[in-house]
């Protein structure tokens, strides 16, 4: 009887120990399950952050691409404006050359006109001298008349040349007037171009400022990309570590669950053995 009581006490103690171990195993399994759930939550948060980082990286790259496209377009407009200014400067130079040639033609025509005027004055003087001497010598008169006719012819030729010079002068004046109009138009165009050039200069300054800002933004984007890439690598490392931890903890949970099942089976066997012992005692 004492042996049975001792056996019952030992079985009871073993039962209590098995229950304690089962409770401890359940508590440990619960804690491990909570750790697994926490790590899974951290893993989901990490994956969300990774997606956010990737989206921010794509957005930064798109903004950088847009800024580069705008900068290239503005540089193209500046080059076109510079080409137009160069072409207009060439046209102004051609107008100045035409004006110089017109001034040279006008100078030559003026000199010819002065020569014709001097010839006419000389012919008139000779004619007067011949008239004063006509009474002295008939032959001299004939000579003078011949000289007079020649002088008249010279005068007519001078008049003709004068008319031609005057006509050419009128043409030159017309050319000069057109050249002046073209020069004035060129000057007006220069003023317009200077204004456009000033605007282009201001735009160029704005473009330079935009370019500096774009470069700064590009540096900032590169820094952000570097940081985001670093954060991405860290997140991937943490994710890999979390996955390994989850796998490890899952194995531990499986082991504890197996141990719990084993303890429950052991507890069940002890309970059945106690029931059988009680039945045997009741038989006595």
UniProtKB/Swiss-Prot annotation:
Which InterPro entries does the UniProt record give?
Tropomyosin
Similarity comment text for this entry: Belongs to the tropomyosin family.
Which stretches are tagged as biased composition: Basic and acidic residues?
12-38
Query: Its function?
Result: Tropomyosin, in association with the troponin complex, plays a central role in the calcium dependent regulation of muscle contraction.
Keyword field: Coiled coil, Repeat
Under PANTHER family, the record lists: TROPOMYOSIN (PTHR19269)
Please give the record's comment on domains: The molecule is in a coiled coil structure that is formed by 2 polypeptide chains. The sequence exhibits a prominent seven-residues periodicity.
Question: SUPFAM superfamilies from the xrefs?
Answer: Tropomyosin
Please give the coiled-coil regions recorded for this protein. 1-284
What protein name is recorded for this chain? Tropomyosin
List the residue ranges of the region (Disordered): 1-47
Oligomeric state and interaction partners are given as: Homodimer.
């Amino acid at each position: 009887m004492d042996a049975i009581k001792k056996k019952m006490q030992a079985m009871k103690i073993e039962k209590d120990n098995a229950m304690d171990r089962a409770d401890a195993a359940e508590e440990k399994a619960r804690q491990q399950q909570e750790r697994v759930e926490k790590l899974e939550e951290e893993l989901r948060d990490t994956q969300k952050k990774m997606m956010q980082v990737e989206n921010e990286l794509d957005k930064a790259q798109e903004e950088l691409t847009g800024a580069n496209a705008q900068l290239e377009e503005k540089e193209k407009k500046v080059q076109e404006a510079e080409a137009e200014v160069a072409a207009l400067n060439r046209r102004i130079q051609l107008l100045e050359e035409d004006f110089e040639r017109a001034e040279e033609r006008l100078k030559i025509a003026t000199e010819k006109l002065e020569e014709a005027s001097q010839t006419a004055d000389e012919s008139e003087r000779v004619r007067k001298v011949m008239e004063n001497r006509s009474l002295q010598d008939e032959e001299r008169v004939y000579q003078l008349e011949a000289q007079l006719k020649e002088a008249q012819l010279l005068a007519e030729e001078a008049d003709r040349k004068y008319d031609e010079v005057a006509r050419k002068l009128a043409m030159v004046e017309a050319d000069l007037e057109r050249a002046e109009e073209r020069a004035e138009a060129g000057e007006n165009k220069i003023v317009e171009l200077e204004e456009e050039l000033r605007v282009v200069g201001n735009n160029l300054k704005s473009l330079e400022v935009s370019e500096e800002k774009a470069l700064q933004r590009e540096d900032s984007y590169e820094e952000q990309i570097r940081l985001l890439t670093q954060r991405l690598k860290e997140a991937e490392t943490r994710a890999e570590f979390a996955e390994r931890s989850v796998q490890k903890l899952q194995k531990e949970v499986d082991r504890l669950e197996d141990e719990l099942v084993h303890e429950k089976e052991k507890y069940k066997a002890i309970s059945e053995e106690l029931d059988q012992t009680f039945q045997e005692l009741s038989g006595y």
